Structure formats: C-alpha cells, structure tokens
Amino acid sequence: MVRPSSSSSASASAARSGAAKRKRNLPTATNPTTRASVAANVKGKGKTKALELDLVVSDDGEEDGELDLESDSGDDDANDDDDNDNEQDDFPEIDLEDSDDDQDVEDEDEPGAQEEVDSDNNKQASTQVHDIQVEEDDSSEEGYNSSDIDNSDFDDDADEGDLAYDSADEDERASAFAARSDASQTSIDEELSRMMSRYSSKPDEHSGSLSATNKLGIPRSQAAQAFDLRVRNPDGSAKGVFKRSEITGEMKRVYPEIDAAYDSDSSTEDPENRIGNVPLEWYDDLPHIGYDINGRKVMKPATKDELDKFLDTVDGDGEAWFSARDKSTGKDVRLSDEELAIIRKLQNAEIPDDAYDPYEDYVDWFTGEDKVMQTALSGRPEPKSRFVPSKWEHKKVMKIVRAIREGRIVPGAAANKDAKPKFYNIWADAHENDTRSPWAVMAAPKLALPGHAESYNPPAEYLFNEQEQKEWQEAEAEDRKQNFLPTKHDSLRRVGAYQNFVQERFERCLDLYLAPRMMRKKLDIHNPENLLPKLPSPKELRPFPITTSVVYVHPDGGRVRCLSVDPTGNWLVTGGDDGRARLWDVAIGRCTASWDVCEGMPKAERSAVHSIAWCPTKNYSLFTAVVHGRVAVIAPPQTQNYAKTSANAISSKSASSSSGATATSTASFLYATSAAATSMPSKPDARSPVAWTRPSEAERRTGVAMHLNITSPSAANLKTVVWHNKGDYFATVCPDSAAGSAGLLIHQLSKHRSQSPFRKASKGSSIQKLVFHPTKPWIFVATQRYIRIYDLMAQSLIKTLQSGFKWISTLDVHPSGDHLMVGSYDKKLAWFDLDLSARPYKVLKYHARAIRSVHFSTSWNLVADASDDGTLQLFYAKVGADYGENLTLVPLKVLRGHEVKNGLGVLDVKWHPNQPWLFSAGADGNALLWTT
C-alpha cells in the first residue's frame, strides 16, 4: 500500500470536504445509475479513510479510466505538469451527471481501490462543479431536510435551499486552499473572486428561498402583514379623509369603518337577547323573544317541526347531531369540539376536567411523622360509591324510558297543550293549592300528665275526708271530678295494682278510634300589630268634618231630640223637649221661626218632639214633626223662595206676585192641602187609626198645613217619622208592643190616606225603626233583635237579617241600597252586606254607651254615629262598584263637643246633603254644625 504525501493528503482532505459540501447541494438526480453509484459510495465510505480519491476530468468531459498510484517523489513532477496545462488551456466544462455516473461505476467495479490524481486538476474540477451548482441553485425553489444532512454525507433528497456556507467551512476551505503548495496565483485569485462575489452579491428579493422569513426570522405567512403608510398612521390606525358634511356644510374628518375581527375587542360576542334570566314562557304568545341592547325586538326565528328535525339528522350534513337549541335566541348553535368532548366524557362516566387528578396521593390523617391525630369528618377522601353510577338512578331512568316507549309519557306534550278556553272554571285548580296530603294522619292527642293527687304520697290537702269520699262514691261516674280516690302510701313498693287500668286503656282506644280530630294551626306571631289590617291614613281620606263651626242654642237648655236638613242645605229644623219645632238658618245660626206642635192638646198629653223629617224632594219645602198622638205637616213660608214650584200644583192664586203671597198660598202649602176637599170624608171613620184634620187658622197662617191624629190609644206613642224618596209617602212608627198592626202606618200626602201594611201583627212584636229603600219598593223594619226586609209591591218577606244585638236602636241604608248600618243600645255598630250574608259583615264597638243614631252621607263616602257617651264617630265607608271589591271601612275621627246630662249624650246626627258637614243634636240643649 502506497502512503500519500502530506501535501496531497491536505489537498485531498480539503477537496473531500468541499466535495461533500457540494454533493449535498446537488439536485436530486433522475438517472438511476447516479442513485446507484451514490448509494455505493455511501456504503463504501468506511473503506475510503486511508486514501483520497480525486477524479481528473479530461477536456472532452469524460473521466480517466485508469487509477494511478503515485509516490511522494512523483508529486512535484505532476504538479509542474498541471501548472503548465492550466496556463495553456482553459478550465474544461464538466458534465455533472456523466462524471457522477462514471465515478459510481468505477467504485462499484473496484470497491476499495483508491488512486491519487493531480491535485490542481482536481481543484479546478471541484471549483467548476461548485460554480455550476450555484447557478442551478439560484433558479431552484426547493428546500432541504436538515435531518437528512445530519444523518449522511451524501443525500439524494437534498434541496437547493442550502446556498449559504457556514463560516467555519469557508475558513477551512480557504486555509486548505492556501496551504496547497501547487496552487497557482491564478487559481487563488479566481477562488477569492468567487468568495467575494458570493458575499457581496445582492440577494434576490423575489426568490422564495430568501423571502420566506422576515427580519425577525418569522415566516411571512405567520407574521403580521405590513401596512401601507400612505393610508395608515405609524401606530397602525387608519388615516382620516377630509370631506364636506352634507348636514352642516363644514369640512370634517371621516375615518373608514372598522371591521371588527373575531379576536377584536368588540361586542359581537355579547348575547343578542338582553332580557336576562327570566322565564321565556312570557314570550310564548308574542312574535318576539326579547330585546337587544338598543331596545329593539328580537324576533323569533323560524322553527322546525319534528319532521324537519328528523330529515336534518338523516339527509343533512350531519350538523344536526352536533347542535343544540339556544333558549335565549331560539336558534340551533353548533357545539364546539371542546363541548362535544365534555359530553362524550359524561356519557362514558369519565371526568370532564382533564386537569383533575382522581388518583392524587393519599393523605394519611392519623399516622406519620409530624402528624397530629384528628378527625376526618371534613377532609376524608371521597368514597368510591360517589364515582360509580347509581343503580337506583338507573332504575328510575329506565322506568321513565319504558313509560315513553309504552306511550304513557309523551315527550313535548306539555308544549302542545291546548290554550285555556275563554270561559273556564276559576275554581278548577283549587285542590292544587291544598298543601295537606289526603293520607296525612293527625297525631293522637297526648294524655294529661299526672298531678299531685295521683302521687303515691300526695299532700294532705289532696286526700279526701270521709264526707268527700262518701259524696264521691255516691256520685255518677260522669259527674265525678276525677275517676280515682287519692291514696297515701308509705313507700313506692307498697303501691298495689291499679284496678281501673284495663278500663282506662279501653276507653283511650275508643277515643282514638271514634272521636273526631281537628288540627289547629298555631300562629307564630311576634308582633301583634301585624294582625291588624293595613288601613290608609286619614289624611288621605279628606275632606271630613273636624271642628265646630256653628252652635244652634235652644232656650232654657232643653234637650234637642231630633233634627233634619232641607234638600237645599240652607235650612235646619230641630225638635226639642218643649214640644216646639224650630227653623234655623244654617249659615248664621239664627232661629227664623218656631212652631208649637202640641198646640191645642191637653197639658197632660203634651210631649217632646220625638222625630222630625224634611221632605226629600226639592219641588216642595215642607217637613213633618211627631209628638205624642199627632203628626204635623208644616210648610214654612220662610223657605218657599228656595223651593222649586210645580206648574200643576200652583194655583192661580199662588202664581200671583210674591208681595201679596201668604203662608197658605205657597206651593208647598197647597200641595199638602190639595186633597183635603176631595179625599177627606165628611165623617171620620171610627175604624181608621188615623184622622186627617185641618189645623186652626192661626196655625195655618204660620205654615201648619195638616194634622194627623192617631185615634188608637195603643199606637199613640209615636217615635219615628220617615219620608220616601219621592216625597209623597211617609211612615210613622210606634214602638209599643200593644200597638199591633197600627205600630207601622204609611201615609200618602197627596191623597190624605193612611194604611197599615201589616193586617196582623204577632203578639209582643215591637217595631223600633223603619227606613225606605232608596230605589226599590222595599222597607227595612227593625225589631228588637232582627231586621226584616219586605217588598211592598209583592207584599212578601224578602230576607231576615240577624244582628246578634240585644236591642236595636237605629238603622240607616246606604244610598246604593245594598248595605245597611245598624246601631244598638248595647254599644255596638254592625255593617250588613245584603248581597253577602244575613249576618253582619263587620261589627264595631268603639263607644262606651248606647248608640242613638247613625246616618250615611248621600254625597260623600262618609258615615257617622252618635252615642250617649257624648261623642260622634266618623268612618270612611267606600263600597266597591263590583262584587269582587271588598268594603273599605276606616275610622277617621272622634268628635267631642256635647256634654252628657242625665246619662244622655248626642241624640241625633244628620249629614249635609251637598257638603261634608255634619249636624248633631245633644241633650245639653245645643245643635252643632261640624265642618272641615
């Protein structure tokens, strides 16, 4: 074996290194012979370590067929010959494919054979090969695989992109080239020129291999795109354009509209429907499903029926299996891969959270170093049963599944229920509100705890003496206070057997078996004021009377028994104990006239004016006053200027001028006396309980139009007179039980006739008060304990009201006719709702003494009562327009202005017909006007 020289070895090593570099940069050869030769060289790489193999290329591009082994002595001659050849001839052109194939074939034929060739020719061939390869690489756009370069020296799949030489390789090549002793100056200059051109040439910007990355080394496909500075600011924002405003005509800067990307900070990801967490059933009957952030309606999307949903799952693109319905918008939303993964894990009984570690290290709570024994109630590991599907839940689910398969449960049937009909039973679901279970069993009542008498050593006061023991034995079992005899024992062990034990157990069983039980719900009330109804403040219910404005003082301080106000509200008439009726001017409190109702009667028969009532019609101005055995009809001439006259009732005499008119020529007086000439019989009927008589001329000149004398001695004690709303009928009441059918008489003023609606009256029945219904032909008759409602047209009893009072004293009917207020001598006031029940709707007890009078206001929602305790109670009483609205009854104020004399206080009370004013009559001899 010939050993190469050191110079040739160095040059061969440098040439081999450069050849290896260039070989990696060669494009992939399409010639199969080339691939085979390269493979052969790769396989024989281990055998070429001792000798260096260089190929000498001839002028015609073919390789030499012989391999010469040269000694060290022949190197100089060979180098000289090569220098001469380089000076004479140009560097030949090399066919890369032919040279590679020939070399590979020679390597296959003679593996392991190595020959050293002329180093200068080899260097020139290597340089030419490299230049050709650079030209080919510049036009190539393929890359390379770095892993292949690292794994082998020769790679058939090497790419063209590795044009850049490593600086270390360049330095090594330059050192090896300069160390060659046979290198000519020309070859050195050429090599240096190539190296300088390689590093000083401008890279091709359009080359894909050089422009694949930016200055930061980031691929341009992944890096942020550069923006044009002509339309963008340095910070990236868009530049505005100056345009003239169409509204103001001024120049303004207009910016381009921002197109919000998916990852931009915008509101595109906010929910469209902004109604919040409210039941969506509220929008079932509406065309929209909610509202957006601007308040516009979010319309319901088109919904698919069951057939469309089925077709989507069969013929669709498969999205139906990965979609879910969004209740807030009504649309089908495609589930993300993460959400689908969670669903699959839940179906497979897996843990949805990948970050959760189900097999974390066990913590020993009781043993170990630095461990203090402690309870594991709060920190013990979870048992395995909590992570295993429940068998019982599986059974419940399968029960529902079987019911669905059998048709007993229809999914989605609740949404397809028919709408509630227009007319339905409002109490149909009343049983659903009953929270009690039908199978609930009430607990048995507990036995009473034993007392001191049942002790084996009871105190001496519980022991019976002989007399008590004898009485206990003689008494019946149900009359005994206790069913055993107390016995004293020295000790508990001396107590014998109880002989009645079996009997008591048997009776206990009978009680549990037969006795009915009732559950009483105990109210847990911390504040008793919560039980009181929430009433409106009296300040919100104004106006109502609160103060005294006018005092109508009667002479001699006699009691004012009664009073009444004319329909115009300008005049007030009162009746006193002295038997006189007085007319008052409401505004100034002046007494304008006075009449002695008992005039012409014996002194023994004189009495107080018990009742007085003004005719309710505004066509005539007259009133009636009641004394013992007489009813006086008075038409005061002082009030005729305020009365409306009727053309049919006014005669030619009364139609004269007011200067010549007298008390007997007024319209009211003529109306009261018009039927006297035609209806009054020549001889009074002895069987009639009433006699219509003409007053004296002196009385007629004062305005007294007619007297009604009660002929029946038993019915002479008249107490009440009441007018009908039309002003033609009035009724009188005698409360004596001996009056019989004459206790109630109805009189017709226009015909001067009187009659009793009751032909027969039960013995002992006494009528206390009477009022007419405001709109119907009914009368309310109050006895001592009951109120009966009669129909005068049908002559029948309609209803009987049970007051629950011991003695009824007064009553009044509401202007609507559906409510009644009743007062009694036992200090109670009852409100009746005639449409509700025969018993009181409300019972009030605010007075300390008997209630004398009660009255409703016809213009205001006010009611007042008078009592013997000297006070008046005001109430706000509002009645609902329909039957579903409850009564509102609110106490307003207590009026105190009358003195109590001889046990009597306020005797009568009346409301002003138009104003919220109140008139009261007291036993102190005064009548008061209460105003706001």
From Swiss-Prot:
One GO BP annotation of this record: maturation of LSU-rRNA from tricistronic rRNA transcript (SSU-rRNA, 5.8S rRNA, LSU-rRNA)
MF term (GO), any: ribonucleoprotein complex binding
Location in or out of the cell: Nucleus, Nucleolus; Nucleus, Nucleoplasm
Intervals holding WD repeats: 555-594, 604-644, 762-800, 803-842, 846-885, 901-932
Gene Ontology CC annotations of this record: nucleoplasm; PeBoW complex; preribosome, large subunit precursor
Gene3D superfamilies: YVTN repeat-like/Quinoprotein amine dehydrogenase
Biased composition (Low complexity): 1-18, 175-184
Alphabetical keyword list: Nucleus, Repeat, Ribosome biogenesis, rRNA processing, WD repeat
Acidic residues bias (residue ranges): 57-119, 150-172
Region (Disordered): 1-229, 679-698
Domain of life assignment: Eukaryota
Start-end of Polar residues biased regions: 27-36
Membership in a protein family: Belongs to the WD repeat BOP1/ERB1 family.
Role: Component of the NOP7 complex, which is required for maturation of the 25S and 5.8S ribosomal RNAs and formation of the 60S ribosome.
Subunit and interaction comment: Component of the NOP7 complex, composed of ERB1, NOP7 and YTM1. The complex is held together by ERB1, which interacts with NOP7 via its N-terminal domain and with YTM1 via a high-affinity interaction between the seven-bladed beta-propeller domains of the 2 proteins. The NOP7 complex associates with the 66S pre-ribosome.
Protein name: Ribosome biogenesis protein ERB1
Species for this entry: Mycosarcoma maydis (Corn smut fungus)
Name of the gene: ERB1
